[in-house]
UniProtKB/Swiss-Prot annotation:
Its cofactor is Mg(2+); Mn(2+). Mg(2+) binds at N13, E390. CDD domains: ASKHA_NBD_AcK_PK (cd24010). Catalyzes the formation of acetyl phosphate from acetate and ATP. Can also catalyze the reverse reaction. This is Acetate kinase. Its main location: cytoplasm. The gene is ackA. It catalyses: acetate + ATP = acetyl phosphate + ADP. Signal peptide: none annotated.
Length: 403
């Protein structure tokens, strides 16, 4: 029997249609349990989980809500595995948006819950789900009522300069309504930046790196001397790169045109830009990058969608070079696409030859499915693939806060 160490953290990440969870030791980085409940609100809801030795998958019901999924997780893993439960010392929650008031990870109390509630308009798909996770955890585990910690995606961007976070609209809207760029995926960007600092044997406070979190949602961040100085997502996670179903950057006049000339409602336009655009909108077929990887050389629309994705990504990377004080240590690719699609990394870096990046084809092709490492030639500026581990990052923040 494997000995369970003390100081375990239970991590919850409630997404718009899924619940990720993990139980791990933030000191030795060992995961005793990790899992995902997906396809919430659909005809079949599945749970995949992995303990120290075995992977499992099963259908756990139909049309399940976040609360249903959480109840299933709690009943299965905490009632059955009491040896794990008794060693848990706190619960860490991923929260997408902290609004303008919350600057860093924090213990959760009624005031923090209210502030997360107020920020729902900035993250309407995620913050409500995050709140369900928080409230359910407090209800199920009153013993940890004062040991729930919120770790915010937006915290990493709180030190960005005004030149990066302000929009060129009347200042009144920032002062009175807090309209500014907040960013997202901050926990992931911070984690992989910290990891590449270790690889390069650099103090984090002197690190200059551009991190690319590429998944169904995608963003780029510029870290200069250990501080994030710019990022591609804005007031909401709609701004920036081309994404799975999100448009990313567009001319705002497109919205006026759709409303005034095409007679579309604001809700219809919002749905199009967030759920029907990006790779799905360009191809008319899919938002799944596995499809684009297979069809890139054979279908015109698939190729066009990928090329537009990489075009936008390479432009952001190149523009962030100007923020690096003439010294860029590395680029990092992470996220489901960044870690597992060599094609995207190759196309993107091929556009950055002028600034010193040259792909090593064999290295690049060999790094996916959880592997990490260098993907450029030895004489090139370095680019790395580093798998993100948001659960570990959240656990490390949680143990730091509760201690």
């Amino acid at each position: 029997m494997v000995k369970i160490l003390n100081n375990l953290i239970f991590v919850l990440n409630c997404g718009s249609s899924s619940v990720k969870f993990a139980i791990l030791n933030p000191d030795n980085k060992k995961k005793y349990l990790s899992g995902l409940v997906e396809c919430l609100f659909l005809s079949k809801t599945y749970m995949k989980w992995k303990d120290l030795t075995t992977e499992h998958k099963k259908c756990i019901g139909s049309n399940l809500s976040h609360k249903d999924a959480l109840n299933f997780i709690f009943n299965k893993f905490f009632l059955e595995k009491k040896d794990i439960y008794k060693n848990i010392v706190g619960i860490g929650h991923r929260v997408v948006h902290g609004g303008n008031k919350i600057k860093s990870s924090t213990l959760i109390d009624d005031n923090i819950i209210q502030l997360i509630q107020k920020a729902i308009s900035f993250a309407p798909l995620h913050n409500p789900a995050n709140l369900i996770g928080i409230k359910t955890a407090i209800e199920k585990f009153p013993i940890f009522a004062k040991k729930n910690v919120a770790v915010f995606d937006t915290s990493f961007y709180q030190n960005m300069p005004e030149t990066s976070f302000l929009y060129a609209i009347p200042y009144f809207f920032y002062k009175e309504h807090h309209i500014r760029r907040y960013g997202a995926h901050g926990t992931s960007h911070h984690y992989v930046a910290s990891e590449v600092a270790l690889i390069l044997n650099k103090n984090f406070n002197s690190l200059n790196v551009i991190t690319c979190h590429l998944g169904n949602g995608a963003s780029v961040s510029a870290v200069c001397n250990g501080i994030c100085v710019d990022t591609s997502m804005g007031l909401t996670p709609l701004e920036g790169l081309v994404m799975g179903t999100r448009s990313g950057d567009i001319d705002p006049s497109i919205i006026f045109f759709m409303y005034q000339k095409l007679g579309m409602s604001i809700d219809e336009i919002h749905t199009i830009l967030t759920k029907e655009s990006g790779l799905l909108g360009l191809s008319g077929i899919s938002s799944d990058f596995r499809y684009f990887e297979k069809k890139y050389y054979f279908e015109k629309k698939a190729r066009l969608a990928v090329d537009i994705f990489c075009h936008r990504l390479s432009k952001y990377i190149a523009s962030y070079m100007s923020l690096m004080e003439n010294n860029l240590d590395a680029i990092v690719f992470t996220g489901g696409i960044g870690e597992n699609v060599p094609l995207i990394r190759e196309i993107t870096l091929s556009k950055l030859l002028l600034i010193g990046f040259k792909i090593d084809t064999q290295r690049n092709l060999g790094i996916k499915n959880g592997k990490h490492g260098l993907i450029t030639t030895d004489k090139s500026r370095p680019a790395f693939v580093i798998p993100t581990d948001e659960e570990l990052a959240i656990a490390q923040e949680t143990i730091k806060i509760i201690k």
